[in-house]
């Protein structure tokens, strides 16, 4: 009797860019899986509603809701951090197991044959309880993953001297020699080690090498230093570079399927009227938010640069200098189709929070960056951009108008900017090669599909 077709459950962490990145990954997996394979994408109801806006689902991919932990009647008044805490508590209490049971029911009783998802412990626990292998998808940078895997060793080394040794390079830790103590993610050697996120990430790093059947990395061959990749490969099973995930075949909606992403504010048409490489694109993602006084400095710096800019900013520029929107040669919108914007010929610079999804979108578009990290692994990503790879610059602390004007002018018109652009385009070419039919990422993805579709 033939075995049943694979039923893959993809479990999302429904905050920041995690779910969107994993959703792109799930779309690619749905496109590549053998005929008869079904996929259930587990996330909260609110997150599913947002992801549905990206376009129609492939026929073999469905949403399955998991508990968000939000008490009835409190939905409208909760802050994002509070929502995250409630979700994690629900997940720890068995929310993902409930989701896997719902996935089985929605698939006509077909048992889940593999669990794919963010590298969080509750996903591993739920997979174990369901008797299914767990395959982890790391959505952040490889350097951040190595830092989390080495947390105990780093804490023993740095001790309570994180502040006094902030500028010291981590040369004693293989794969991390290009990074300083200050670049490490929050909760590794500084910050509140008992904060729920710090504890969670520490636990997942301890569990990952033992529990995961394979680990997908959001990077491509040649991007990370060889000693970093070697260090990861020594600790993780089937460590497969597959990124940027949004470039996997089938990951993005396409115009020929009438699923092209919307551009409700006319960003691309506005860019069409600008000269090549003349525009600075500014976006700090969905969760990073600068203080009002820093936003004012950013606005003043953009105006002082004299360059046209496209600024994706939720809400209004209440803190901007008086008359800014009337005087400055820019467009401010609450949302922009970022991948399409970065690919546009008019965009010559990217001012970013250095979230990993944004960094990878910038790399794959060949656009040099000016990084203003805020939290998490963003400082490490900014260090990678500015020092390890050299295709951008990083602000030293909060943005000032002078620093913004100088960064934009450098990236768009300066000699250093030309060097950074050349490096960005070199990396872009490497990305393209990795995703050719016989490229490293395509071959690794074929191996990944084979692993998750075993039944």
Swiss-Prot record:
Q: Can you tell me which residues bind an anthocyanidin?
A: 18, 148, 376
Its EC number(s): 2.4.1.115
In the UniProt record, does the keyword Cytoplasm occur?
Answer: no
Q: What class of enzyme is it?
A: transferase
What species does this protein belong to?
Answer: Hordeum vulgare
Which positions are catalytic residues? 18 (proton acceptor), 118 (charge relay)
Gene giving rise to this polypeptide: BZ1
Task: Give the function comment from the record.
Answer: In the presence of other necessary color factors, this glycosylation reaction allows the accumulation of anthocyanin pigments.
- The molecule here is called Anthocyanidin 3-O-glucosyltransferase
Keyword Transmembrane among UniProt keywords: no
Q: Which pathway, per its entry?
A: Pigment biosynthesis; anthocyanin biosynthesis
Matching CDD domains, A to Z?
A: GT1_Gtf-like (cd03784)
Keywords, alphabetical: Glycosyltransferase, Transferase
Homology family: Belongs to the UDP-glycosyltransferase family.
Tell me a Gene Ontology molecular-function term this record carries. anthocyanidin 3-O-glucosyltransferase activity
Where does this protein hold UDP-alpha-D-glucose? 139, 336, 338, 353, 356, 358, 361, 377-378
Signal peptide positions on this chain: none
Q: So what does this thing catalyse?
A: an anthocyanidin + UDP-alpha-D-glucose + H(+) = an anthocyanidin 3-O-beta-D-glucoside + UDP
Give the superkingdom in one word: Eukaryota
List this protein's GO terms for biological process: anthocyanin-containing compound biosynthetic process
